[in-house]
Swiss-Prot record:
It is found in: Cytoplasm. Residues 174-376, 412-526, 679-1039 form a coiled coil. Keywords: ATP-binding, Coiled coil, Cytoplasm, DNA-binding, Nucleotide-binding. This is Chromosome partition protein Smc. Contains large globular domains required for ATP hydrolysis at each terminus and a third globular domain forming a flexible SMC hinge near the middle of the molecule. These domains are separated by coiled-coil structures. GO terms for biological process: chromosome condensation; chromosome segregation; DNA replication; sister chromatid cohesion. ATP binds at P34, N35, G36, S37, G38, K39, S40, N41. Belongs to the SMC family. Homodimer. One of its GO terms (molecular function) is DNA binding. GO terms for cellular component: chromosome; cytoplasm. Residues 534-644 form the SMC hinge domain.
Length: 1185
């Protein structure tokens, strides 16, 4: 059999949340299901796995939309995967596999992966694999309703792609396209190389000149360097001779100056002594003078204060006299102001009484005006309302007259409609009786089938409950099995690890570990049973492991021997092999140690026991264990340990359960314990416990495996029963569907008839009501018309009466407002007089208050002045006494100052003599130092010249030390030698700017030009060969397309005539050659004129497109073809023709058809149903026909 699609596996793609597999055989497979169930998601999945990149084609907004997005009860998935498996026994695809599986995987992050037979590949590899097979996103193996429309009326490019796929030139076009790309790249590379070559060749000539100049520059530079080197060494030799002479002179000056400096130092010390004594005398003199002047200043200040105080006393006495006179004047002014206040109060009372009378008159006027204005406002509103009513009456009367005419006309129309509807009602009633009889018969048949389905479904539900229960139990058992297996593996690994640790002495120090291994392997001439490790011979409860291990310390690695002879042999072996040191405990000589008066500690809270008594061991090791642990007590905590230690006077070790230690002598060890990688003491216990756990786990695993096998067997039986019941239900459902369709048709017809009859009946009743309403409305409207006419006359009379009353009221208001204005003017005048009188009262009152305040202020001022006079008199007496004392003290200071002046003159004479000697000696020293500095400067200058020469020798000649310099250089004529150097420099200068890199650059450029010239020749040859390939490929494509296009035209005409039972169809190549021209479709259905396909009806278009599809399949059958509801627009007769063609073509092509149509289902070999038992999640049900 030729290649065909074996399976589609979908997981997480769109609505297929669970892993779903569709298995296909040859022939026709139909996929059916209600709208929205996810049928088309299967064709989208195939299109997607074949490399579709258009999100729009996949009916999404972005590529991640194809991943299952979750439902109310399910979480979104992180990836989706689709796999197609094809049978490739005939090796139609270019891979050496019988089955080829193509897969695509997409992650929610946007990352996409492609696989061929589970090997990751590129999208391009998948396109190349299916090229010219009709399979692929651009092929015609997947045709949907949208693709049908594109085939007929879409872009010319899309149509040509499909027809070229059928004509078998896609592979050639792809190869030509690849060759064109290579040619384009070759041309670009050729242009690039030519540009680079041109640039290099332009650069080569100037670079050749620069290369020659650089060579000349290097030759002259080398000669100049040699001559400059000779001159520099010769100069260095002469400079060194001068330096030696100058250094000798410096040593002589330094020696002479040293003696002069000693003498100068002694003279300066004498001068300093005189200066210090003189400074002390002068300091004392200065202090006395300062004190003298300070006291004189104080006397002046005291005398000034006395004068000032006398003046202040006189001023204050004058001020008191003036204040008394001012008090008397204030009292007289106050009496006059009080009399003015009394007069103003009388005037103010009279004005307020007159103002009250005027206010009462104004209030009466205002009340009368408000009352009349209110009445006028009310009448104006009534008048306005009456006028509005008049307009409304006129409008209502006009409307009523028009409405009455309309009502009479409506009544006549209602009578005509009632007669027509009565006739229709009787016709509908007869048709309903006939439909009801048909429906009753069908319902009986449907009821019987439903009962059968219900029985089968109940049995399936019972089985499903059983399956679910078994599945839950199975899941629990399998989870338990998985956990137990993991536990078993962990226990086994732990057991092996512990045994391995025990076997290889893991946890002991390196020396002991190696020693015991060698003893066990008989590398040491010692019996294996004569040596034991302390950590191996003891066993104990788990709770004591930490404290005993801490108690043992390094002793845990001690080696127990039967006697001291074995210990000596082992020690010698360790020394000879340089294996390190170990501690040995010979049983024959070791003596145990005990705690005396142990009973004293046993009653203390927290005491547990002696460490040696808490472990188990063989009797032969008792002395050894007593030696190690006999003087160690174990207690519960650190507080207990301190209590025991104090009582025992810190004479032995105490260890707590948590590992804290109080050592003998008082040292304390404690804190957190690091996790132990190897528990030596508890290892035996751990091995035994782990072995028991392994055995128990094995037994449990055997029981669980037996339970799982039994549950799976029971579950399989229930599944088989369910499949039988489902098969029966499926057959009944097909029959039930047919009956339901018939019943639905009858119900729809009956419903329409009933609705039509009810509509007619409702309309009749409504018309009768309308007729009655019409009559009542007519009578009411005529009655309203009479009433409105009467009301209109009354309204006009009332308006006239209101307007006369309004006129009278307005005249009355005018008279009252004139009287009110007169009174308000009078009130304003009185108010002004009152305000003026109040201001005068306020002014007088304020002046009296100010006088009172001033009076109090003057009295206070007099009292204060009297106090100040008394205080100043006291200060004046005190200052006079102080001035007298200061004058006596000043006389004593004057005597001390005169004595200090005499002593200062004597010391200055001595200092002048010594300073003269210092100056003479300093002059001599300075002259010597000046000579010394001159020599130093000359030396510095010479050394600098010397360093410069060394620097030049180092930098220019690469001479780095004196050893490299040959000082025997001789120059007969230095000036002539320097002249040659100047000539060389001039020659170098004439060369101008020199590019030393040009030498290397010139060589490299020559190499590059040679290489690029070779590359250019290769590219020209490649370009010519590619052009030949493209021309040959183009001719091949034209030939193949032309040949197959003729066949395709014939096939299209034949299939069109078969499907339409006559007519004709053609494919026409226009505007260009075979590879670029447009391809138009022209058709002529039977009995119609020849026309463009775009002018046909939807059904005709659909059938024409199907004809073209089958024509393409005739010329080049695809291994499989997926058709997604392409017959949707066809009527039942054309669906049958389409189905016949499917059956006919299914001999060469495998068809997977997504359909709703009964005719297509009937020719199918296998039916797959797509349902959504869970909202948002598609599920597949299969049925082989």
């Amino acid at each position: 059999m030729s290649m065909f699609l074996k399976t589609i596996e979908i997981k997480g793609f769109k609505s297929f949340a669970d892993k779903t597999e569709l298995i296909f055989t040859g022939g026709i497979t139909s996929i059916v299901g209600p709208n929205g169930s996810g049928k088309s998601n299967i064709s989208d999945a195939v299109r997607w796995v074949l490399g579709e990149q258009s999100v729009k084609t996949l009916r999404g907004g972005k590529m991640e939309d194809v991943i299952f997005a979750g439902t109310q009860f399910r979480k979104p998935l992180g990836l989706c995967q689709v796999s197609l498996t094809l049978d490739n026994e005939d090796k139609k695809l270019s891979l050496e596999y019988s089955n080829i599986t193509v897969s695509r995987r997409l992650y929610r992050s946007g990352e996409s992966e492609y696989y061929i037979n589970n090997v990751q590949c590129r999208l391009r590899d998948i396109h190349e694999l299916f090229m010219d097979t009709g399979i692929g996103r651009e092929g015609y193996s997947i045709i949907g309703q949208g693709r049908i429309d594109a085939l007929l009326s879409g872009k010319q490019e899309d149509r040509r792609l499909l027809l070229e796929e059928a004509a078998g030139i896609v592979k050639f076009r792809w190869r030509r396209s690849e060759a064109e790309k290579k040619l384009e790249n070759t041309e670009v590379n050729l242009i690039r190389i030519e540009d680079i070559l041109h640039t290099y060749e332009e650069r080569l000539k100037p670079l050749e000149l620069e290369n020659k100049k650089a060579d000349e520059f290097l030759r002259l530079s080398e000669e100049l360097k040699d001559k400059e080197k000779t001159v520099l060494i010769y100069s260095l030799k002469k400079i060194q001779h001068k330096i030696d002479k100058l250094e000798s002179s410096m040593e002589r000056i330094t020696s002479s100056n040293r003696e002069s400096h000693l003498e100068l130092t002694k003279l300066r010390e004498d001068v300093n002594g005189y200066n210090i004594r003189m400074e002390n005398i002068m300091d004392e003199s200065t202090r006395c003078e300062k004190d003298y002047y300070d006291k004189r200043e104080l006397i002046n200040q005291g005398e000034n204060k006395i004068k000032l105080l006398k003046q202040k006393i006189e001023d204050l006495e004058d001020n008191i006299k003036r204040n008394y006179l001012e008090l008397k004047q204030i009292e007289n002014d106050k009496i006059k102001k009080s009399e003015g206040i009394t007069l103003q109060n009388q005037n103010l009372l009279e004005l307020k009484n007159r103002e009250k009378e005027v206010n009462i008159g104004i209030l009466d006027y205002e009340n009368n005006i408000k009352k009349i204005e209110k009445d006028i406002y009310s009448r104006e509103n009534i008048c306005k309302k009456l006028k509005e009513d008049k307009i409304q009456y006129f409008s209502n009367i006009s409307k009523l007259r028009n409405h009455i005419i309309s009502i009479k006309k409506d009544g006549e129309n209602i009578v005509e409609k009632i007669d027509k509807l009565k006739s229709s009602y009787e016709s509908y009633s007869k048709a309903i009786i006939i439909s009801s009889e048909k429906k009753n018969k069908l319902l009986g048949e449907i009821s019987n089938i439903k009962k059968n389905i219900s029985v089968y479904q109940n049995k399936i539900d019972e089985n499903n409950s059983g399956i679910l229960e078994l599945t839950n139990v199975l899941n629990l058992k399998e989870n338990s099995l998985q956990k137990l297996n993991a536990l078993y593996n962990t226990l086994e690994a732990n057991y092996k690890m512990l045994v391995n640790f025990h076997k290889h002495y893991e946890g002991y120090n390196r020396t002991v570990k190696a020693l015991m291994e060698n003893i066990k392997n008989h590398k040491l001439d010692v019996p294996a049973q004569s040596c034991f490790l302390v950590g191996e011979i003891i066993s104990l409860q788990k709770k004591f492991e930490t404290c005993i291990e801490i108690s043992l310390g390094n002793s845990i690695s001690s080696v127990i021997t039967n006697n001291e002879i074995i210990a000596k042999i082992i020690i010698k072996y360790l020394k000879d092999n340089k294996m390190g040191r170990a501690t040995f405990l010979p049983i024959s000589i070791i003596k145990g140690r005990k705690i005396s008066n142990l009973h004293k500690f046993e009653d203390i809270k927290g005491f547990i026991g002696v460490a040696s008594e808490l472990v188990s061991y063989s009797k032969e090791f008792k002395d050894v264990l007593d030696y190690i642990l006999g003087r160690t007590i174990i207690c519960e905590n650190i507080d207990n340990a301190f209590e025991i230690a104090k009582l025992a006077e810190y004479s032995f070790k105490i260890v707590t359960l948590s590992g804290d230690v109080v050592n003998s002598g008082g040292a304390i060890t404690g804190g957190s314990l690091q996790k132990r990688s190897s528990n030596i003491i508890g290892r035996k216990r751990e091995i035994e416990e782990t072995l028991v756990k392994i055995e128990n786990t094995k037994e449990t695993l055997q029981v669980l495996n037996g339970d799982i096998r039994r549950i799976k067997s029971d579950k399989e039986k229930l599944h088989c029963q369910n499949e039988d019941f489902k098969e029966k239900i499926h057959l009944d459902n097909i029959e039930l569907t047919k009956l339901h369709q018939q019943n639905d048709t009858i119900e729809r017809e009956t419903k329409k008839l009933i609705e039509s009859r009810e509509t007619a009946n409702r309309e009749i009743k409504l018309l009768y009501k309308n007729k009655e309403v019409n009559l009542n409305e007519l009578q009411e409207e005529e009655k309203k018309l009479k009433e409105y006419s009467k009301e209109e006359i009354k309204n006009d009379d009332y308006i006239l009466k209101m307007e006369e009353e309004l006129k009278e009221g307005r005249n009355r208001i005018t008279d009252l407002k004139e009287g009110l204005t007169s009174l308000k003017v009078k009130r304003a005048q009185i108010s002004e007089n009152i305000l003026s009188s109040e201001r005068e009262l306020s002014r007088l009152d304020q002046e009296i208050k100010s006088m009172d305040i001033k009076n109090r202020s003057i009295v206070e001022e007099i009292k204060l002045s009297e106090k100040i006079i008394h205080k100043n008199e006291l200060n004046m007496y005190s200052n006079e006494k102080e001035v007298k004392d200061l004058k006596q003290y000043m006389e004593k200071l004057q005597e001390s100052i005169e004595k200090s002046h005499v002593k200062t003159i004597e010391l200055k004479q001595k200092i002048n003599v010594s300073n003269e000697k210092v100056d003479n000696l300093t002059l001599i020293i300075n002259k010597k130092e000046t000579s010394f500095h001159k020599i130093q400067l000359e030396l510095t200058k010479l050394n600098s010249q010397k360093d410069n020469i060394y620097s030049r020798l180092k930098e220019d000649m690469n001479i780095t030390c004196d050893g490299d310099i040959e000082y025997d250089v001789q120059i007969e004529n230095l000036e002539e030698y320097k002249s040659k150097i100047v000539h060389l420099k001039s020659s170098i200068s004439k060369l101008g700017v020199v590019n030393l890199g040009a030498i290397e650059e010139y060589k490299n450029l020559q190499k590059k030009i040679t290489f690029l010239s070779s590359q250019k020749e290769d590219l020209i040859k490649s370009k010519q060969e590619l052009k030949k390939v493209i021309d040959a490929m183009t001719e091949k494509m034209k030939g193949v397309f032309k040949e197959n296009f003729v066949k395709l035209k014939k096939n299209f005409n034949d299939t069109f005539r078969e499907l339409f039972k006559g007519g004709s169809a053609d494919l026409v190549l226009t505007k260009g050659d075979e590879l670029t021209g447009n391809i138009d479709i022209t058709v002529q259905p039977p009995g119609k004129k020849l026309q463009n396909i775009n002018l046909m009806s939807g059904g005709e278009k659909g059938l024409s497109a199907i004809a073209l599809l089958f024509a393409m399949l005739k010329i080049k059958p695809t291994p499989f073809c997926i058709l997604d509801e392409i017959e949707a627009s066809l009527d039942d007769a054309n669906v049958l023709r389409y189905a016949e063609f499917l059956r006919k073509f299914s001999r060469d092509t495998q068809f997977i058809v997504i359909t709703h149509r009964k005719g297509t289902m009937e020719v199918s070999d296998v039916l797959y149903g797509v349902t959504m038992e869970e909202k948002g999640v598609s599920k597949i049900i299969s049925l082989k026909l």
